[in-house]
Amino acid sequence: MIRKAIARVVERQDLSEAEMIEVMDQVMSGGATPAQIASFITALRMKGETVDEITGAARVMRDRALPIRVGKSVLGIDRDDINLDRETILDTCGTGGSGTNSFNISTTVAFIVSACGVKVAKHGNRAVSSSCGSADVLEALGVNLDVTPEVVERSIAQIGIGFLFAPALHGAMKHAIGPRREIGIRTIFNILGPLTNPAGADCQVLGVYREDLVEKLAQVLKKLGCRSGFVVHGSDGMDEITLTGESTVAEITADGVKLSKVTPEQFGLERAPLTELHGGDAQGNAVIVRDILSGKDGAKRRIVLLNAGYALVATGKAKDVAEGIRLAAETIDSGAAMKQLERLVALTNEAE
């Protein structure tokens, strides 16, 4: 199948979701050669991946992931577009690869949202383009990444947050590692991670490194069963809602996908230059995360509050972003968010 798929994609013909599933099954089962994998993902990148193609690939990755089973939780605020009888799990995993050298914003957000009573299954990996990915900063903060799926499940169930280390849960990806590394360009695999949470997160805030991916990945998440969420991109290139200027936001609701542009001023937040949002290596970013969770003021706190505000809307904990920002600020200042970090560090290290 992959040889036929390569020939079609080279001719700029789109594959159906079913055809993409067949190709990715071949890739992830070891049935395709490294040359075939490299040729296929390069041709796909040049053509441009469609919603159906990304959806099909994500379904295969989800099916082959080691599952993380999480018990049911109940939302704190009744929103008409969210079914309270269903499980609510949030992921704040983004694509990375923004090249803006920002600190770990979505990881910081995860602790705040979990302290608000939302179960968070934070999916992540080591650095893509920066010097510090979510796994790197969590390790520097003292979180033990080398734990069993059962420990991750217990962590989410008992304290409301767990880290899903992608390499440990997506073993079938090993067949694509070599070709991806050797061709050295962004491909469909750079956007699949946030779409394939092994805990089946049904609420997401997903940051992307290209504006044209915003609506596309929102449509993919909708097809994959996401009940509520946002796909976001900053005009400065950040895979977050930025403080430097305008951001593109796609909201996912029961009614579909709605695209909008937002600025910090809409929420009473002062803009900041990108330099004030820069991070560093894992140890430096760990200091930044601790500072924010300890209540330190400044641009880094503001961008975390803004993104946390959206996450709290996605999960139904806030009626709007302004309320979400207020709740996030209160949660930090009460010490509850820092407590979540301390509990995650303790639980993952007890498991050794």
From Swiss-Prot:
Residues involved in anthranilate 1 binding: 94, 125
Domain of life: Bacteria
GO CC entries: cytosol
Pathway: Amino-acid biosynthesis; L-tryptophan biosynthesis; L-tryptophan from chorismate: step 2/5
Binding residues for Mg(2+) 1: 106, 240
Cofactor: Mg(2+)
Residues that, per the record, bind Mg(2+) 2: 239-240
Binding site for anthranilate 2: 180
Catalyses which reaction(s): N-(5-phospho-beta-D-ribosyl)anthranilate + diphosphate = 5-phospho-alpha-D-ribose 1-diphosphate + anthranilate
EC class: transferase
GO molecular function: anthranilate phosphoribosyltransferase activity; magnesium ion binding
UniProt subunit comment: Homodimer.
PANTHER family, alphabetized: ANTHRANILATE PHOSPHORIBOSYLTRANSFERASE
Physiological role: Catalyzes the transfer of the phosphoribosyl group of 5-phosphorylribose-1-pyrophosphate (PRPP) to anthranilate to yield N-(5'-phosphoribosyl)-anthranilate (PRA).
Protein name: Anthranilate phosphoribosyltransferase
Gene behind this protein: trpD
